[in-house]
Amino acid sequence: RVIIMTKTFVDRYNAVAGSVVMILTLIFGTYWYVFAGYLLCNILDWLTGWYKSRKLGKESSKAGLKGAAKKVGYWIIIAVAFLIPALFIHLGKDLLGIDLGFLVLLGWFTLTSLLVNEIRSILENLVECGYNVPEFLIRGLAVTEKLIHAGVTIPEDHD
C-alpha cells in the first residue's frame, strides 16, 4: 500500500515537473533555466535588500515597492533585448535574405549583465548585514562585470 502511494506521488510529481519544464521551454526556449535563475536572483535580491533595510532601521513599503517595480523594469528590458533581435532576424530573412541570427546575442548579453548585477547586489546586501562573504566571490563578480562592460563601447556623440 505504501509503495503504491509513493509510486502515485512520484508519478504525479514527474507529470507536474515535466509540464512546468515543458511550458518554460515553450516560453523561454531551451535555456529556460537561465531565466529561472535570474528570477530566483530577483527574489533573493529583494529579500536580502528588505532584510538589510530592516536591520539598518530603514525599512519602508515605498522603498520595497520601488525595488519590486525596478525588477519588473529589468524584465521589460530583457524582453525588449530579445524582441529587437527577433524582429531584425525575421526582417533580414524575409526582406533582405540575410541571416542575422547572431543578433540574438544582444538578448543574452543583456540577461548576463543583469544577472551579474543581481548576484553582486545579493552579495553586497549580505556583506552589509554582517555576513562573511568569501572574497573570491566578490572579486570574481567584479572582474566578470568589468569584462562584460569592456566588450561594449558606446562612442560619444560630438555634435
Describe each PLM feature range.
Residues 1-12, 116, 120-159:
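Membrane-proximal cytosolic segments adjacent to transmembrane helices
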Residues 7-10, 30, 59-67, 101:
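Membrane-helix interfacial "entry" motifs
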Residues 15-25:
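Hydrophobic, membrane-inserted alpha-helices
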Residues 26-34:
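Transmembrane helix interruption/hinge and helix-loop junction motifs
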Residues 38-48, 74-82, 110-121:
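Alpha-helical transmembrane segments of multi-pass membrane proteins
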Residues 40-52, 59, 95-97:
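N-terminal intrinsically disordered, cationic/polar leader segments
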Residues 56-78:
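Juxtamembrane helix-capping/reentrant segments at transmembrane boundaries
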Residues 70-111:
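Mid-chain, well-packed structural core segment of small domains
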